[in-house]
From Swiss-Prot:
The modification Phosphoserine is found at S291, S305, S480, S481, S494, S496, S628, S747. The keyword Transport applies. Residues 423-432 have a biased composition (Acidic residues). Residues 689-722, 806-840 form a coiled coil. Its main location: membrane. This is MICAL-like protein 1. A motif (NPF2) lies at residues 640-642. Pfam families: bMERB_dom, CH, LIM. GO terms for cellular component: adherens junction; centriole; ciliary membrane; cilium; cytoplasmic side of endosome membrane; late endosome; late endosome membrane; recycling endosome membrane. The modification Phosphothreonine is found at T311, T314, T477, T479.
Length: 870
């Protein structure tokens, strides 16, 4: 016979051809022993089962093997029960057709949403004794006559297979069948009682009432009443509507359309009423994970940008169905043969987590004094050519009353500068590391194009202009290095930086202006060679530096000539009583070295040292009047205290004094490092709200398909003429295939949801374990050791569960790739056949005699050509 049934029957015969004991006569009793299912599976996937070991008499095992292999390996849900195949002498024809159609769709057009068995034409011709299907062989016509148009109606009048739901006891239609652990359910009955999500084998438990279930993943994370019970009530209202439509159709066929429309209207109204508020709220964080223990260190941000960008990154958009079959996964299939157990309740990510993370940087964490990364130096921006800049402002401060009073006054009046982030990335710098400063409140440079009051700095002092020729390392500095190195030492914990500089300034100014004998001969000789009005002005809290002129010079290289000191600089130097010296720079050097009394680069106890200049800074500074360079204040750099190298020129007494001012060091280098929590937000991360929304959309589509499928099944079993039955069968196969794709997508979303939760929980367990291991082992208690064992065991369980999900999804992807290759090969074969047919048509236009005459004429012309030449 022609039509979808005949085409499906012919396809089954071709697949089972040559297999022992398999004879496909119809789509009912021929499949009872299960060998036909196994033969189709073995034809396409011989690696899945051994067909030679099967016996025709073992009906139950054959069917069980075929159904389990198709469900676990191919993602085809089992619509049939092996017990029904044993108990019934003639299985239900519509059930067999529906199940075999999924084999057909899987092996011929996998991934195509609208795929269905081939239909001869849109309007099939009326049946005639001689009409046969193109795919049916000559001997198949008599066998196809057994499948009369009313065969489905006859089977519908017979006793249907055991289709009672194990949960509610009502009849289960084919489109509603859901087999789980050997029991038959309605799809809407096999749901979580609280969150109404489809259950996955191995991840649910019995509910409070008999026949109900509770999932171990979502219901514990959703608020009460968010999605509970609404789906069941909707289904209960839809079933009477379908029954009323069926009764009305039996009584009066003209009322069937109105009944279907009424049922659809009731379904739509129930969906609007019950599914509008189904957007679940953000899950709340479990109480035991809400806040870290009191003794746990606060996780440190890697960069400054990460501390401000606390919101999770926006995930990549992905399509709703990903071509209707990205991952083929059956809902009823377990996670790798049931290896996945109930995972612990994972820690959700959401708004509470962000608030918790935002509260951490408000206080100074303990690790800020332990390890500080060394920032790199940025080049100073090019200042404008007009305006005196901060340099003359600093000189006016000395002229009006000295830097000491201004510093003391600003310590109580000026606002505290912006905290400097030690993790900010800057350019690579050169130089030997100096003593670090673990101070988290150092201000970065704030260049300003207009005159502004000087920014308070942890290291403003007149002695910053001291030449660094005294240090033995700076005499060999190459001339190509334009960078300067400025590193203050640690400050006293109890004193503010400005108060320290004020006290130091008062101690470092001797009453006499005579140079100190500690002044080096090298610096005096170099300064005497450049004494012609090139005295370096008193430095404000920053070292003058131009982006165009390098700040490093060879000691013998003369400075820039023709530069004069600004009037403000002269007045400030004269008011300080230092104009009697040959050079203002010598006087500054003498005054500073007179107070220090040594060549040590270490500062006094409790004081912040002045940053060192390179050897070239003994020469005059760049021109101030012509270029007007802005002075740039640079915050002190930080380094790891465990990589500290003492200066070789530091005296033991100064070194001891500096140690007294350091903060308390950690007990051992192995403990106390900052613990950074691993981020788990990947590009493939899907927010929970999106997962919930897509699953709700899928459930609504499944409800609509099931409602249409119940009505269509009743029509098919009720009987119809051959033409309308063929059309209904095509619609039926398409409906089953669409439902199968939606179920696979829903199963994939459930696995993605579980995978993300397990990954988040693993990150939490790892961080808690690191915090525990970060504690010295001598301070461990019995409770800590027991907690370590529990965390290690939980970590191993989480890893195994994640591995099971990943392996399951990978197998689905590999299977889908193989199916895509098969489909591509089939398409290529069809294209090749079309090309061959077109070539044969083109060849038919030429007659053989004409071609032979044409070739003979060409040969004669070639043979005559040499004779003509001769």
């Amino acid at each position: 016979m022609a039509g979808p049934r005949g085409a499906l029957l012919a396809w089954c015969r071709r697949q089972c051809e040559g297999y022992r004991g398999v004879d496909i006569r119809d789509l009912s009793s021929s499949f009872r022993d299960g060998l036909a299912f196994c033969a189709i599976l073995h034809r396409h996937r011989p690696d899945l089962l051994d067909f030679q070991s099967l016996s025709k008499e073992n009906v139950f095992e054959n069917n069980r093997l075929a159904f389990e292999v198709a469900e676990k390996e191919l993602g085809i849900p089992a619509l049939l029960d092996p017990n029904d195949m044993v108990s019934m002498s003639v299985p239900d024809c519509l059930s067999i057709m529906t199940y075999v159609s999924q084999y057909y769709n899987h092996f011929t057009s996998s991934g195509q949403a609208a795929a269905s068995p081939p239909k001869p034409g849109k309007d099939p011709a009326p049946p005639s004794p001689t009409s046969t299907s193109p795919a049916v062989q000559p001997g198949e016509e008599a066998q196809g006559d057994d499948l009369s148009p009313d065969s489905l109606s006859e089977q519908g009048k017979q006793q249907p297979p055991s289709s009672a739901c194990a949960a509610c006891g009502q009849r289960v239609h084919l489109v509603q069948r859901y087999l789980a652990e050997g029991r038959l359910y309605h799809r809407h009955c096999f749901r979580c009682r609280q969150c109404s999500s489809t259950l996955v084998p191995g991840s649910y438990s019995s509910g409070p009432e008999e026949g109900t279930f509770v999932c171990a993943e979502r219901c514990t994370r959703l608020g009460p009443g968010s999605r509970s019970g609404t789906r069941l009530l909707s289904q209960q209202r839809q079933q009477p509507a379908a029954a009323e439509a069926k009764d009305a159709e039996d009584n009066d066929p003209s009322l069937s359309v109105a009944a279907v429309a009424e049922a659809d209207r009731l379904q739509a109204s129930s969906e609007v009423q019950f599914h509008t508020p189904t957007k679940p709220p953000l899950p709340s964080k479990p109480q035991e994970l809400a806040s870290p223990p009191g003794g746990r260190p606060t996780p440190a941000p890697r960069k400054a940008s990460e501390s401000s960008a606390l919101t999770p990154p926006t995930p990549r958009p992905r399509s709703s169905l990903q071509q209707d079959g990205t991952v083929e996964q059956s809902v009823s299939s377990g996670l790798v043969n049931g290896r996945l157990q109930e995972p612990p309740v994972p820690k959700p990510r959401g708004t509470p987590k962000l608030s918790e993370r935002m509260a951490a940087p408000r206080k100074d964490p303990p690790w800020i004094t332990l390890v500080q990364t060394e920032p790199k130096k940025k080049p100073a921006p090019q200042p404008p050519s007009s305006g005196p800049g901060p340099l003359s402002q600093a000189y006016r401060q000395v002229e009006d009353g000295g830097l000491e009073e201004q510093t003391q006054k600003s310590s109580g009046t000026e606002p505290e500068p912006k905290p400097y982030n030690p993790f900010e990335e800057e350019e690579e710098e050169e130089g030997e590391p100096a003593p670090p400063v673990p101070s988290p409140s150092l201000a970065p440079p704030v260049p300003s194009p207009s005159p502004a009051p000087p920014v308070p700095s942890p290291a403003p002092a007149p002695s910053e202009a001291t030449p660094k020729s005294l240090h033995p390392w700076y005499g060999i500095t190459p001339t190509s290095s334009p960078k300067t190195k400025k590193r203050p030492a640690p400050r006293a914990p109890s004193a503010s930086p400005l108060a320290i500089h004020a006290s130091r300034l008062s101690h470092s100014e001797p009453p006499s202006a005579t140079p100190s004998p500690a002044l080096s001969v090298e610096s005096l000789s170099s300064e005497s060679s450049s004494h012609t009005a090139n005295a370096e002005p008193l430095e404000p809290p920053a070292v003058p530096k131009s982006s165009s002129d390098p700040a490093v010079h060879v000691p013998g290289t003369p400075g820039t000539s023709g530069n004069s000191v600004t009037p403000s600089a002269n007045s400030s130097l004269s008011s300080s009583g230092e104009l009697g010296q040959p050079s203002g720079e010598q006087m500054l050097q003498a005054r500073t070295k007179g107070s220090a009394g040594t060549h040590s680069t270490k500062p006094f106890s409790g004081a912040t040292p002045t940053p060192f200049l390179l050897a070239g800074d003994r020469n005059p500074a760049p021109p101030v009047g012509s270029a007007s360079p802005q002075l740039q204040i640079k915050s002190s750099c930080k380094e790891n205290p465990f990589n500290r190298k003492p200066s070789p020129s530091a005296s033991p007494t100064v070194r001891k004094a500096t140690k007294g001012a350091k903060p308390v060091r950690p007990p051992a280098p192995g403990h106390g490092f900052p613990l950074i929590k691993r981020k788990v937000q990947a590009d493939q991360y899907i927010p929970e709200e999106d997962i919930y929304g897509e699953m709700d959309n899928i459930e609504r589509q499944l409800d609509a398909l099931e409602h249409s499928g119940v009505l269509l099944e009743e029509k098919l079993r009720g009987g119809a003429n051959e033409g309308s039955e063929d059309d209904m069968l095509v619609d039926w196969f398409k409906l089953i295939h669409e439902k199968h794709l939606l179920v696979r997508r829903e199963s994939e979303l459930i696995y993605v949801f579980k995978q993300q939760n397990l990954e988040q929980r693993q990150a939490d367990v790892e961080f808690e374990l690191r915090c525990l291991l970060n504690k010295p082992e001598k301070d461990w208690t019995d409770e800590d050791r027991a907690r370590e064992k529990v965390l290690m065991q939980e970590l191993m369980t989480l890893i195994e569960q994640r591995d099971a999900i990943v392996n399951c999804l990978d197998e689905d992807r590999q299977r889908e790739e193989e199916e895509d290759k098969m489909l591509e090969t089939m398409i290529k074969k069809k294209d090749f056949q079309r090309e061959a047919e077109s070539d044969s048509k083109k060849k038919g236009k030429f007659k053989t005699i004409k071609v032979l005459k044409f070739l003979g004429n060409k040969r004669e012309a070639k043979s005559k050509a040499p004779g003509d030449k001769s």
